[in-house]
Curated annotation (Swiss-Prot):
Protein name, as recorded: Cytochrome c oxidase subunit 7A2, mitochondrial
Organism: Canis lupus familiaris (Dog)
Keywords of the record: Acetylation, Membrane, Mitochondrion, Mitochondrion inner membrane, Oxidoreductase, Transmembrane, Transmembrane helix
Primary localization class, coarse: mitochondrion
InterPro entries: COX7a, Cyt_c_oxidase_su7a_sf, Cytc_oxidase_su7a_met
Origin: domain of life: Eukaryota
Entry similarity comment: Belongs to the cytochrome c oxidase VIIa family.
Gene Ontology CC terms: mitochondrial inner membrane; respiratory chain complex IV
Taxonomic lineage: Eukaryota, Metazoa, Chordata, Craniata, Vertebrata
Pfam families given in the database record: COX7a (PF02238)
Localization: Mitochondrion inner membrane
Length: 29
């Protein structure tokens, strides 16, 4: 997860512009 998360977080930030903490947390959960 640690390796895949950073890559996805960057994509989410660029696309949605939403904080990776909120978006990533919900998406991963």
């Amino acid at each position: 997860f640690e390796n895949k998360v950073p890559e996805k977080q960057k994509l989410f930030q660029e696309d949605n512009g939403i904080p990776v903490v909120l978006k990533g947390g919900v998406a991963d959960a």
